[in-house]
Amino acid sequence: MDDATNKKRKVFVSTILTFWNTDRRDFPWRHTRDPYVILITEILLRRTTAGHVKKIYDKFFVKYKCFEDILKTPKSEIAKDIKEIGLSNQRAEQLKELARVVINDYGGRVPRNRKAILDLPGVGKYTCAAVMCLAFGKKAAMVDANFVRVINRYFGGSYENLNYNHKALWELAETLVPGGKCRDFNLGLMDFSAIICAPRKPKCEKCGMSKLCSYYEKCST
């Protein structure tokens, strides 16, 4: 890795960590390391907004304190409880199946092994990384569409048009996650992508790394 590339990566990580420390958003699920709560919340957050999930969060976890509570509750009742966030029947079915497998195969506790988590029904690479990082403190890149967009824009070049499943993008993402700061970095990048490097009308003038950003350079010429 040449000096310029190394500097660009260091500035990226430093900017994201600084943003987390100064401008992060606050959601109730960020105040827990409970693997059950984190895993279920990730299911609830899919294809909806954090704002919608926030509205049902407290009530949901008061009623459903563990996988056993989900499994013993009729699907129709769960769907009714999460109706506000959308796709309620589909989510309720996913939650029931997930609860069944975790109870039958792991005694009702989320496994700590990455492969075991990935093998759970409805769990993909992002959700697995979220559980590994946010619940178990393991180094893992939480790569989603927002993560991809920021990498595409900032690093540009051979990374400019890489899609979510491209191996090179995941390899870069994993190298960016700083040891001991996995949670801060992943959540910081999530917030940065929502507030600064938004899909439309990014606030480049407020970005701490715009001088090294390929997207900003292209837009400025």
Curated annotation (Swiss-Prot):
Domain HhH: 105-133
Enzyme Commission code: 3.2.2.-, 3.2.2.29
GO biological process, one term: mismatch repair
Pfam families per UniProt: HhH-GPD
Co-factor requirement: [4Fe-4S] cluster
Annotated phenotype, changing residue 144 to A: 15-fold lower activity
Claim: Hydrolase is one of the keywords in the record: yes
InterPro entries: DNA_glycosylase, Endonuclease-III-like_CS2, Endonuclease3_FeS-loop_motif, Endouclease-III_FeS-bd_BS, HhH-GPD_domain, HhH_base_excis_C, MIG/MutY
Gene Ontology molecular function terms on file: 4 iron, 4 sulfur cluster binding; 8-oxo-7,8-dihydroguanine DNA N-glycosylase activity; adenine/guanine mispair binding; G/T mismatch-specific thymine-DNA glycosylase activity; metal ion binding; oxidized purine DNA binding; purine-specific mismatch base pair DNA N-glycosylase activity
Catalyzed reaction equations: Hydrolyzes mismatched double-stranded DNA and polynucleotides, releasing free thymine
Highest taxon of source: Archaea
Record note on what altering residue 187 to Q does: Accelerates the A/G reaction and decreases activity on T/G and U/G. Changes substrate discrimination between T/G and A/G by a factor of 117 in favor of the latter
Ligand binding ([4Fe-4S] cluster): 197, 204, 207, 213
Gene3D superfamilies: Helix-hairpin-Helix base-excision DNA repair enzymes (C-terminal), Hypothetical protein, domain 2
Entry keyword annotation includes Amino-acid biosynthesis: no
Keywords, in A-Z order: 4Fe-4S, DNA damage, DNA repair, Glycosidase, Hydrolase, Iron, Iron-sulfur, Metal-binding, Plasmid
Documented effect of changing residue 50 to V: Affects T/G versus U/G selectivity. Changes substrate discrimination between T/G and A/G by a factor of 117 in favor of the latter
Family of the protein in this entry: Belongs to the Nth/MutY family.
Function: DNA glycosylase that excises thymine from T/G mismatches and uracil from U/G mismatches. Acts as a repair enzyme able to counteract the mutagenic effect of spontaneous hydrolytic deamination of DNA 5-methylcytosine (5-meC) residues that leads to the formation of T/G mismatches. May also repair U/G mismatches arising from hydrolytic deamination of DNA cytosine residues. G/G, A/G, T/C and U/C are minor substrates.
The protein's name: Thymine/uracil-DNA glycosylase
The organism of origin for this protein: Methanothermobacter thermautotrophicus (Methanobacterium thermoformicicum)
